[in-house]
Amino acid sequence: MTIRLLGRTEIRHLAKSIDFRPRKSFGQNFVHDANTVRRIVSASSVNRSDHVLEVGPGLGSLTLALLDRGARVTAVEIDPVLATQLPTTIAAHSHSEVNRLTVLNRDILTFKQSDMTEMPTALVANLPYNVAVPALLHLLAEFPSIRTVMVMVQAEVAERLAAEPGGKDYGVPSAKVRFFGNVRRYGMVSPTVFWPIPRVYSGLVRIDRYETSPWPTDTEFQEQVFELIDIAFAQRRKTSRNAFAEWAGSGNESASRLLAASIDPSRRGETLSINDFVRLLQRSADWHTVPKADDAGDDADAQAKADGAQVSTL
Protein backbone atom coordinates (compact mmCIF):
# COMPACT_ATOMS: atom_id res chain seq x y z
CA MET A 1 0.00 0.00 0.00
CA THR A 2 1.40 3.38 -0.96
CA ILE A 3 0.70 6.71 0.68
CA ARG A 4 -2.35 8.55 -0.64
CA LEU A 5 -2.15 12.31 -0.25
CA LEU A 6 -5.21 14.28 0.76
CA GLY A 7 -7.28 16.19 -1.79
CA ARG A 8 -9.83 18.99 -1.39
CA THR A 9 -12.84 16.66 -1.14
CA GLU A 10 -11.10 14.41 1.38
CA ILE A 11 -10.05 17.36 3.54
CA ARG A 12 -13.58 18.69 3.79
CA HIS A 13 -15.09 15.23 4.26
CA LEU A 14 -12.59 14.47 7.02
CA ALA A 15 -13.32 17.74 8.82
CA LYS A 16 -17.06 17.05 8.60
CA SER A 17 -16.65 13.49 9.89
CA ILE A 18 -15.08 14.76 13.12
CA ASP A 19 -17.37 17.79 13.32
CA PHE A 20 -14.39 20.10 12.99
CA ARG A 21 -14.49 23.76 12.02
CA PRO A 22 -11.25 25.71 11.43
CA ARG A 23 -10.49 28.27 14.12
CA LYS A 24 -9.12 31.68 13.20
CA SER A 25 -7.49 31.97 16.61
CA PHE A 26 -5.22 29.04 15.69
CA GLY A 27 -4.62 30.29 12.14
CA GLN A 28 -6.06 27.07 10.72
CA ASN A 29 -5.91 26.93 6.91
CA PHE A 30 -5.28 23.45 5.48
CA VAL A 31 -3.43 22.67 2.24
CA HIS A 32 -5.45 20.35 0.01
CA ASP A 33 -3.28 20.37 -3.13
CA ALA A 34 -0.96 17.37 -3.54
CA ASN A 35 1.40 19.22 -5.88
CA THR A 36 1.90 21.96 -3.30
CA VAL A 37 2.84 19.61 -0.47
CA ARG A 38 5.16 17.68 -2.79
CA ARG A 39 6.78 20.97 -3.75
CA ILE A 40 7.32 21.92 -0.10
CA VAL A 41 8.82 18.55 0.81
CA SER A 42 11.03 18.47 -2.28
CA ALA A 43 12.37 21.97 -1.56
CA SER A 44 13.16 20.94 2.01
CA SER A 45 15.51 18.16 0.79
CA VAL A 46 14.52 15.90 3.70
CA ASN A 47 15.06 12.16 3.31
CA ARG A 48 14.92 8.91 5.28
CA SER A 49 17.85 9.96 7.45
CA ASP A 50 15.95 12.97 8.80
CA HIS A 51 13.83 13.44 11.88
CA VAL A 52 11.41 16.20 10.91
CA LEU A 53 9.64 18.51 13.32
CA GLU A 54 6.32 19.56 11.78
CA VAL A 55 4.38 22.41 13.37
CA GLY A 56 0.61 22.57 13.00
CA PRO A 57 0.03 19.39 10.95
CA GLY A 58 -3.70 20.02 10.95
CA LEU A 59 -5.52 17.29 9.03
CA GLY A 60 -2.30 15.69 7.78
CA SER A 61 -1.64 16.81 4.19
CA LEU A 62 2.01 17.74 4.68
CA THR A 63 2.55 14.98 7.25
CA LEU A 64 1.72 12.32 4.65
CA ALA A 65 4.11 13.86 2.12
CA LEU A 66 6.92 13.95 4.69
CA LEU A 67 6.37 10.31 5.62
CA ASP A 68 6.34 9.45 1.92
CA ARG A 69 9.96 10.70 1.77
CA GLY A 70 10.94 8.14 4.40
CA ALA A 71 11.52 10.65 7.18
CA ARG A 72 10.54 10.21 10.81
CA VAL A 73 8.08 12.92 11.82
CA THR A 74 7.19 14.50 15.13
CA ALA A 75 4.07 16.58 14.57
CA VAL A 76 3.23 19.24 17.15
CA GLU A 77 -0.43 20.26 17.12
CA ILE A 78 -2.05 22.69 19.56
CA ASP A 79 -5.63 21.60 18.76
CA PRO A 80 -6.46 18.45 20.79
CA VAL A 81 -9.13 17.31 18.31
CA LEU A 82 -6.70 17.39 15.40
CA ALA A 83 -3.88 15.86 17.46
CA THR A 84 -6.12 12.92 18.38
CA GLN A 85 -7.37 12.42 14.80
CA LEU A 86 -4.02 12.65 12.99
CA PRO A 87 -2.68 9.10 13.64
CA THR A 88 -6.00 7.65 12.45
CA THR A 89 -5.87 9.69 9.25
CA ILE A 90 -2.25 8.74 8.56
CA ALA A 91 -2.95 5.04 9.19
CA ALA A 92 -5.90 5.15 6.77
CA HIS A 93 -3.82 6.73 4.00
CA SER A 94 -0.58 4.78 4.44
CA HIS A 95 0.70 1.49 5.81
CA SER A 96 3.69 0.98 8.11
CA GLU A 97 4.62 4.66 7.68
CA VAL A 98 2.42 5.48 10.65
CA ASN A 99 5.08 3.88 12.84
CA ARG A 100 7.42 6.74 11.96
CA LEU A 101 4.98 9.33 13.31
CA THR A 102 4.73 10.82 16.77
CA VAL A 103 2.03 13.37 17.53
CA LEU A 104 2.33 15.80 20.43
CA ASN A 105 -0.49 18.04 21.61
CA ARG A 106 1.52 21.12 22.56
CA ASP A 107 1.77 24.87 22.11
CA ILE A 108 4.78 25.39 19.85
CA LEU A 109 5.70 28.66 21.57
CA THR A 110 6.47 26.78 24.78
CA PHE A 111 7.75 23.59 23.12
CA LYS A 112 11.19 22.59 24.38
CA GLN A 113 13.88 19.94 24.07
CA SER A 114 12.58 17.99 27.06
CA ASP A 115 9.32 17.41 25.14
CA MET A 116 11.23 15.18 22.70
CA THR A 117 13.22 11.97 23.15
CA GLU A 118 15.15 12.46 19.91
CA MET A 119 16.26 15.81 18.55
CA PRO A 120 14.98 16.89 15.10
CA THR A 121 17.27 17.55 12.15
CA ALA A 122 14.77 19.55 10.10
CA LEU A 123 11.77 21.82 10.54
CA VAL A 124 9.10 21.66 7.82
CA ALA A 125 5.80 23.39 8.43
CA ASN A 126 2.85 25.39 7.23
CA LEU A 127 3.21 27.85 10.09
CA PRO A 128 0.08 29.51 11.48
CA TYR A 129 0.14 33.12 10.29
CA ASN A 130 -0.42 34.54 13.76
CA VAL A 131 2.67 32.99 15.37
CA ALA A 132 4.99 32.37 12.41
CA VAL A 133 7.94 34.58 13.35
CA PRO A 134 7.96 33.94 17.14
CA ALA A 135 7.60 30.18 16.53
CA LEU A 136 10.39 30.13 13.97
CA LEU A 137 12.86 32.05 16.12
CA HIS A 138 11.96 30.02 19.21
CA LEU A 139 12.54 26.69 17.46
CA LEU A 140 15.82 27.76 15.88
CA ALA A 141 17.10 28.80 19.30
CA GLU A 142 15.70 25.84 21.23
CA PHE A 143 16.80 23.12 18.77
CA PRO A 144 20.34 23.69 17.46
CA SER A 145 20.07 20.17 15.97
CA ILE A 146 17.76 21.62 13.28
CA ARG A 147 19.99 22.13 10.25
CA THR A 148 17.33 22.83 7.60
CA VAL A 149 14.09 24.80 7.76
CA MET A 150 11.38 24.95 5.09
CA VAL A 151 8.31 26.91 6.11
CA MET A 152 5.24 28.28 4.41
CA VAL A 153 4.22 31.64 5.84
CA GLN A 154 2.18 34.66 4.82
CA ALA A 155 3.78 36.22 1.72
CA GLU A 156 4.48 39.46 3.55
CA VAL A 157 6.30 37.57 6.29
CA ALA A 158 8.31 35.62 3.70
CA GLU A 159 9.40 38.91 2.15
CA ARG A 160 10.48 40.25 5.53
CA LEU A 161 12.40 37.14 6.47
CA ALA A 162 14.37 37.15 3.21
CA ALA A 163 14.84 40.93 2.96
CA GLU A 164 18.34 42.39 2.75
CA PRO A 165 19.67 45.33 4.83
CA GLY A 166 18.46 48.71 3.62
CA GLY A 167 15.40 47.34 1.81
CA LYS A 168 11.86 48.44 2.66
CA ASP A 169 10.98 44.99 4.04
CA TYR A 170 14.13 44.61 6.11
CA GLY A 171 13.42 44.58 9.82
CA VAL A 172 13.68 42.70 13.09
CA PRO A 173 12.73 39.24 11.66
CA SER A 174 15.18 39.66 8.76
CA ALA A 175 18.11 40.36 11.06
CA LYS A 176 17.26 37.88 13.82
CA VAL A 177 16.74 34.86 11.55
CA ARG A 178 20.17 35.47 10.03
CA PHE A 179 21.72 34.97 13.46
CA PHE A 180 21.05 31.26 12.83
CA GLY A 181 21.61 30.76 9.10
CA ASN A 182 21.20 31.75 5.46
CA VAL A 183 17.73 32.59 4.16
CA ARG A 184 16.24 32.07 0.68
CA ARG A 185 12.80 32.56 -0.89
CA TYR A 186 11.24 29.57 -2.68
CA GLY A 187 8.33 31.23 -4.45
CA MET A 188 4.68 31.98 -3.77
CA VAL A 189 1.67 29.76 -2.97
CA SER A 190 -1.85 30.65 -4.12
CA PRO A 191 -4.67 30.99 -1.57
CA THR A 192 -6.74 28.56 -3.68
CA VAL A 193 -4.75 25.54 -2.44
CA PHE A 194 -6.06 26.07 1.10
CA TRP A 195 -9.29 25.37 2.94
CA PRO A 196 -10.62 27.70 4.13
CA ILE A 197 -9.23 30.05 1.47
CA PRO A 198 -7.16 32.80 3.15
CA ARG A 199 -7.24 36.38 1.94
CA VAL A 200 -3.51 36.52 1.27
CA TYR A 201 -0.86 34.67 -0.69
CA SER A 202 1.70 32.52 1.09
CA GLY A 203 5.43 32.25 0.52
CA LEU A 204 8.01 29.51 0.98
CA VAL A 205 11.20 30.27 2.87
CA ARG A 206 14.18 28.01 3.42
CA ILE A 207 16.78 28.55 6.13
CA ASP A 208 20.03 26.61 6.22
CA ARG A 209 21.81 26.83 9.55
CA TYR A 210 25.45 27.87 9.33
CA GLU A 211 27.66 24.77 9.22
CA THR A 212 30.00 26.56 11.59
CA SER A 213 28.52 29.60 13.27
CA PRO A 214 30.57 32.79 12.74
CA TRP A 215 29.80 33.86 16.31
CA PRO A 216 28.89 32.42 19.74
CA THR A 217 25.49 30.72 19.86
CA ASP A 218 24.88 30.55 23.60
CA THR A 219 21.61 31.98 24.88
CA GLU A 220 23.17 34.96 26.63
CA PHE A 221 25.04 36.12 23.54
CA GLN A 222 21.99 35.61 21.30
CA GLU A 223 19.74 37.57 23.63
CA GLN A 224 22.16 40.48 23.76
CA VAL A 225 22.46 40.60 19.96
CA PHE A 226 18.66 40.48 19.70
CA GLU A 227 18.37 43.38 22.13
CA LEU A 228 20.62 45.48 19.90
CA ILE A 229 18.44 44.60 16.92
CA ASP A 230 15.31 45.61 18.84
CA ILE A 231 16.88 48.91 19.85
CA ALA A 232 17.92 49.71 16.27
CA PHE A 233 14.53 48.97 14.71
CA ALA A 234 12.52 50.65 17.44
CA GLN A 235 14.00 53.84 15.99
CA ARG A 236 14.86 52.68 12.46
CA ARG A 237 14.98 56.15 10.89
CA LYS A 238 17.43 57.50 13.45
CA THR A 239 21.15 57.40 12.87
CA SER A 240 22.88 54.53 14.64
CA ARG A 241 24.62 57.06 16.87
CA ASN A 242 21.31 58.37 18.16
CA ALA A 243 19.53 55.01 18.22
CA PHE A 244 22.16 53.47 20.48
CA ALA A 245 22.76 56.59 22.62
CA GLU A 246 20.72 55.40 25.61
CA TRP A 247 22.25 51.93 25.44
CA ALA A 248 25.77 53.34 25.34
CA GLY A 249 25.09 56.05 27.91
CA SER A 250 25.57 59.02 25.59
CA GLY A 251 25.75 59.96 21.93
CA ASN A 252 29.51 60.26 22.04
CA GLU A 253 29.92 56.86 23.66
CA SER A 254 27.53 55.38 21.09
CA ALA A 255 29.65 56.82 18.28
CA SER A 256 32.82 55.44 19.87
CA ARG A 257 31.39 51.94 20.12
CA LEU A 258 30.08 52.05 16.55
CA LEU A 259 33.43 53.22 15.21
CA ALA A 260 35.18 50.48 17.18
CA ALA A 261 32.91 48.03 15.32
CA SER A 262 33.75 49.67 11.96
CA ILE A 263 30.22 51.07 11.63
CA ASP A 264 29.65 54.63 10.44
CA PRO A 265 27.66 56.31 13.26
CA SER A 266 25.60 58.17 10.65
CA ARG A 267 24.19 54.93 9.21
CA ARG A 268 20.57 54.16 10.04
CA GLY A 269 19.68 51.04 12.00
CA GLU A 270 17.71 49.67 9.06
CA THR A 271 20.96 49.32 7.06
CA LEU A 272 22.81 47.23 9.65
CA SER A 273 23.38 43.54 8.89
CA ILE A 274 23.49 40.73 11.44
CA ASN A 275 27.28 40.89 11.14
CA ASP A 276 27.17 44.55 12.17
CA PHE A 277 25.03 43.86 15.23
CA VAL A 278 27.27 40.99 16.32
CA ARG A 279 30.42 43.03 15.81
CA LEU A 280 28.97 45.95 17.76
CA LEU A 281 28.30 43.68 20.72
CA GLN A 282 31.69 42.00 20.53
CA ARG A 283 33.55 45.31 20.34
CA SER A 284 31.51 46.46 23.34
CA ALA A 285 32.39 43.40 25.41
CA ASP A 286 33.71 45.60 28.21
CA TRP A 287 30.14 46.87 28.62
CA HIS A 288 28.74 43.28 28.46
CA THR A 289 25.18 43.94 29.70
CA VAL A 290 22.76 45.21 27.07
CA PRO A 291 19.58 46.73 28.58
CA LYS A 292 16.21 45.94 27.05
CA ALA A 293 14.94 48.39 24.43
CA ASP A 294 11.99 49.50 26.56
CA ASP A 295 14.00 50.23 29.68
CA ALA A 296 17.36 51.23 28.23
CA GLY A 297 16.86 54.84 29.31
CA ASP A 298 16.27 53.80 32.91
CA ASP A 299 19.44 51.74 33.14
CA ALA A 300 22.12 54.41 33.48
CA ASP A 301 23.66 52.51 36.38
CA ALA A 302 24.11 49.33 34.37
CA GLN A 303 27.61 50.26 33.24
CA ALA A 304 28.72 50.89 36.76
CA LYS A 305 27.34 47.50 37.89
CA ALA A 306 29.45 46.86 34.90
CA ASP A 307 11.96 18.37 21.37
CA GLY A 308 4.27 3.15 16.30
CA ALA A 309 2.23 6.60 16.25
CA GLN A 310 1.34 7.98 19.55
CA VAL A 311 -0.44 11.02 20.87
CA SER A 312 0.83 12.75 23.96
CA THR A 313 -1.19 15.42 25.74
CA LEU A 314 1.04 15.81 28.78
Curated annotation (Swiss-Prot):
Residue ranges, annotated region (Disordered): 291-314
EC code(s) of this entry: 2.1.1.182
UniProt xrefs under InterPro entries: KsgA/Erm (IPR001737), rRNA_Ade_diMease-like_C (IPR023165), rRNA_Ade_Mease_Trfase_CS (IPR020596), rRNA_Ade_methylase_Trfase_N (IPR020598), rRNA_adenine_dimethylase (IPR011530), SAM-dependent_MTases_sf (IPR029063)
Catalytic activity: adenosine(1518)/adenosine(1519) in 16S rRNA + 4 S-adenosyl-L-methionine = N(6)-dimethyladenosine(1518)/N(6)-dimethyladenosine(1519) in 16S rRNA + 4 S-adenosyl-L-homocysteine + 4 H(+)
Location within or outside the cell: Cytoplasm
EC category: transferase
Record-listed S-adenosyl-L-methionine binding positions: N29, V31, G56, E77, D107, N126
UniProt-listed SMART domains: rADc
Biased composition (Low complexity): 303-314
Keyword check for Methyltransferase: yes
Keywords of this entry: Cytoplasm, Methyltransferase, RNA-binding, rRNA processing, S-adenosyl-L-methionine, Transferase
GO cellular component term, pick one: cytosol
Entry coiled-coil feature ranges: none
Keyword Zinc-finger included in the entry's annotation: no
HAMAP family: 16SrRNA_methyltr_A (MF_00607)
Protein name: Ribosomal RNA small subunit methyltransferase A
Native organism taxonomy: Bacteria, Bacillati, Actinomycetota, Actinomycetes, Mycobacteriales
